[in-house]
Amino acid sequence: VASIHSGFGRFLILNWPHTDSEHLMVSSEQMQNIEKEMFSMGMPVEALMEKVGIGISSWILDRHGLIENGAIVLVGPGHNGGDGLVVARELYMAGVDISIWCPFPLKKQLTQKHFDYAMQIGIENLERKPDSNSDLLWIEALFGLGQSRIISDEILRLLNSKKTFSPDKLISID
């Protein structure tokens, strides 16, 4: 891993052209290495979570057709779920009809804090799994880079059903 400096700060570079970072694609292993390097330099998890969530919500808001009928964030137990909760908060604050669904107990304190705040500001927490036949945008924040557990058949069926019904209304974040 190498780094460069610019007027906007220090950037980590692996083996890609930094001149086209908007279209950058990295593997899970590369992203884990980037995050590891960032954290070793002192980047707080909280700051990265905010940066990621705000960036994703901005991307979604720029594509209004995705959210014209509203959105649901599927929240996982770890920091990926926290990223999703930041996205939910930002979309809610922008006036999007948003709800969340948490099929697993939350395991990370930071994710729990974002969940608690989402509840305080009035974001709806669905008690039951969402309808995969709806025209709502699904933002999947269930599984992160460190995913090691087997994904349940129920979750797989639900995501596959949404993908089949409206593939343009399902995005995964991490």
Language model features with spans:
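Extreme N-terminal basic, low-complexity initiation segments
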Residues: 2-7
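Positively charged, low-complexity intrinsically disordered leader regions
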Residues: 11-66
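Glycine-rich phosphate/dinucleotide-binding loop and adjoining beta-alpha-beta core of small-molecule
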Residues: 9-14, 22-25, 65-74, 79-173
